[in-house]
């Protein structure tokens, strides 16, 4: 992403360490010889690869790879109807295999949306009284794609997101 090269696992020939440790062996000719060490370093390969992914996507992972794929944001966290619907929606998302979280903190709606944008969550599902009454969601897409004519039914969003995850779309 920023043009650097990365090294994951390595295999190295080391001629210095045997000398430092004064390592020797007796060869077929009966003489002492200095060995050459072979190092294999796979330790950290997974961590390095994750670092490469984070850098490549600048933290904005594709939906299938994102740790949190959708966040449910009720407009009024003190509204019983919105909170009941938010929890029902969370159960539906979970049943569909969509990793979601509920942002029901006592902060302003704008603050919660900005924070989720900063976290680069692929989808924000904003629900108010109208959405709760009609089983709909207002979708805020991280990429500002035009797939959603808001509001959409919760089922339509779930089908779309589950398909995107299954196909591993970028």
Regions found by a protein language model. Give the residues of each.
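NTP/phosphate- and nucleic-acid-binding module
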Residues: 1-170
């Amino acid at each position: 992403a920023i043009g650097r090269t990365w090294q994951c696992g390595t295999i190295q020939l080391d001629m210095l360490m045997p000398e430092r440790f004064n390592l020797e062996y007796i060869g077929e000719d009966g003489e002492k010889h200095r060995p050459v060490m072979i190092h294999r370093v796979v330790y950290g390969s997974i961590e390095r690869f994750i670092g490469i992914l984070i850098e490549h996507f600048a933290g904005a992972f594709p939906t299938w790879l994102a740790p949190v794929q959708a966040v449910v944001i009720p407009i009024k966290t003190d509204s019983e109807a919105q909170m009941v619907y938010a929890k029902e929606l969370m159960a539906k998302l979970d049943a569909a295999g969509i990793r979601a979280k509920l942002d029901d903190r006592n902060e302003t709606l704008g603050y919660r949306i900005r924070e989720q944008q900063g976290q680069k969550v692929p989808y924000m599902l904003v629900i108010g009284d109208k959405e709760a009454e009609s089983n709909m969601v207002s979708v805020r897409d991280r990429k500002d794609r035009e797939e959603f004519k808001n509001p959409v039914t919760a089922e339509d969003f779930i089908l779309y997101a589950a398909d995107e995850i299954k196909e591993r779309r970028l």
